């Protein structure tokens, strides 16, 4: 994978379920932290970070695939976002999980990673902002309060 960005290498290893390759992308020690609906995940070594990703990418033991991804990278920082989809038993309902990685690099290794997960969904529908505002009692724009009148004062 020479020439590929670190986020692209991480994505390729996740897609290929190559968890040993994932571990090789992390520095030792690494500052790896992830927040999911399950809890706060922490790793300080590459092997544990890779095992955490393995657990995340193996939902329910059924076949899962990355259906969407996006990566960005500079020499010191990068991001990786992806959606994992699979069918949940017993009635093959679709499930989607989105994760976002914020990465810090030291040389050609990931020195720090912050991973955020939006939680389990059947889909990610567009949000109706105005409906959400109404439900929270935020309604429309409120008129500005009237300010007191300015009165001209004559200097004597």
Residue ranges and their predicted role:
Residues 19-77:
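A solvent-exposed, acidic/Ser-Thr-rich amphipathic alpha-helical stretch
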Residues 7, 14, 26, 49, ...:
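Hydrophobic alpha-helical core bundles mediating ligand binding, dimerization, or RNAP-core interactions
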Residues 2-29:
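Short acidic-aromatic low-complexity motifs
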Residues 2, 6, 48, 95:
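Soluble or luminal CAZymes and related metallo-dependent hydrolases
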Residues 57-156:
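A beta-strand edge to alpha-helix "cap/lid" segment located at domain peripheries
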Residues 4-13, 39-40, 56-59, 145-147:
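Short, mixed-charge, low-aromatic patches
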């Amino acid at each position: 994978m020479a020439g590929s960005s670190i986020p692209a290498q991480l994505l390729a290893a996740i897609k290929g379920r190559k968890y040993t390759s994932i571990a090789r992308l992390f520095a030792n020690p690494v500052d790896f932290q992830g927040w999911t609906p399950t809890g706060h995940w922490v790793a300080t070594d590459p092997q544990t970070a890779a095992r955490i990703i393995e657990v995340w990418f193996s939902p329910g033991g059924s076949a899962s695939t990355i259906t969407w991804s996006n990566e960005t990278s500079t020499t010191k920082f990068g991001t990786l976002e992806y959606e994992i989809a699979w069918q949940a038993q017993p009635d093959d309902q679709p499930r989607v999980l989105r994760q976002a990685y914020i990465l810090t690099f030291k040389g050609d290794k990931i020195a720090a990673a912050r991973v955020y997960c939006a939680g389990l969904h059947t889909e990610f529908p567009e949000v109706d902002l105005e409906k959400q505002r109404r439900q929270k009692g935020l309604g429309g724009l409120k008129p500005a309060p009237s300010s007191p009148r300015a009165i001209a004062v004559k200097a004597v």
